[in-house]
Amino acid sequence: MKRTYQPSRIKRKRTHGFLARKKTAGGRKVLKNRRRKGRWRLAV
């Protein structure tokens, strides 16, 4: 059986990266909440 996690830097950045978050309203909300919480890392 193939494992579910097949790491790929490109996929990682495209789906969870900062620019991907910035693009959508929901993503911007995520960034806002993470900033407010004081997360050391906002996006991947």
UniProtKB/Swiss-Prot annotation:
Keywords: Ribonucleoprotein, Ribosomal protein. Pfam families: Ribosomal_L34. Gene3D superfamilies: 1.10.287.3980. GO terms for molecular function: structural constituent of ribosome. Residues 1-44 are annotated as: Disordered. GO terms for biological process: translation. One of its GO terms (cellular component) is ribonucleoprotein complex. PANTHER family: LARGE RIBOSOMAL SUBUNIT PROTEIN BL34M, MITOCHONDRIAL RIBOSOMAL PROTEIN 34 FAMILY MEMBER. Belongs to the bacterial ribosomal protein bL34 family. This is Large ribosomal subunit protein bL34. It comes from Thermosipho africanus (strain TCF52B).
